[in-house]
């Protein structure tokens, strides 16, 4: 059995299951919520080790937190960093089924 660095589990927080992310999966792309301080090389290494696939590229974005009102007080949700991971041809991660 291959050894997986426990830090890889900290980099990838969860898969993002939205309509847009599901449509991107048809083009060999998977969207993950990642640690806010994670770099593209760290994300690439974590995905390759955890899911045993080859990564072609990694694009990241930060979704700014929304302003919300709760019982008359205003607050802001936390910012979320997302990574759009493009996989090499022939490799696949299916996060939309089996949930």
Swiss-Prot record:
Keywords: Ribonucleoprotein, Ribosomal protein, RNA-binding, rRNA-binding. One of its GO terms (biological process) is translation. One of its GO terms (molecular function) is rRNA binding. InterPro entries: Nucleotide-bd_a/b_plait_sf (IPR012677), Ribosomal_uL23-like (IPR013025), Ribosomal_uL23/eL15/eS24_sf (IPR012678), Ribosomal_uL23_CS (IPR001014). One of its GO terms (cellular component) is ribosome. Belongs to the universal ribosomal protein uL23 family. One of the early assembly proteins it binds 23S rRNA. One of the proteins that surrounds the polypeptide exit tunnel on the outside of the ribosome. Forms the main docking site for trigger factor binding to the ribosome. Part of the 50S ribosomal subunit. Contacts protein L29, and trigger factor when it is bound to the ribosome. PANTHER family: 60S RIBOSOMAL PROTEIN L23A. This is Large ribosomal subunit protein uL23. It comes from Rhodopseudomonas palustris (strain BisB5). The lineage of its organism: Bacteria, Pseudomonadati, Pseudomonadota, Alphaproteobacteria, Hyphomicrobiales.
